[in-house]
Amino acid sequence: MESAVLNVARYDVFKLTEAVLAGQTARVLRMLDGLRAEGEAAVLVHWHVADTIAGLKRVKDALGQGKPLPVAFNEGRVWGVKQRLYERVLPLLAEHQLAHLVEAASICDGVVKGLKHPLWPLDPWDALRHLVLLLVQAVATPPAPRGKAPMLRAGPRLVLQA
């Protein structure tokens, strides 16, 4: 009995954002399902994902102003393991993609708090799934030729079945 209890996977939101930045789609979806099953608050999960998106934007903006990477990390409040992940994904993200992701995080925030949006799922966890998939798509896509970065689109409502 004790070994069965010890084998139960525990998911945490910090590992979720690391998996998102690593582009590990299957792991991210499994972790989201696990967090939901464990009763984690959707608002807390959203906060961590949105904070990661905001951090990417802050660091990208600081780099765009010509600041060195360590200064950009300090200004973006990015420390530890996330620095290595940010270094990998920042070259993949255009400014307009980050602006779109910030907007998507804002829409998802509303959905998680009970607001409806015509292009987003009504269920908070489905909206979170949509948001993390947008971010995973952005960080897993190879860079486009300069000036031609792909635009992420909210598109039609994403319906995922477990």
Positions of PLM-derived features:
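Small-residue-rich helix-loop
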Residues: 1-101, 136, 158
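Amphipathic alpha-helical interaction/assembly segments
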Residues: 37-60, 97-162
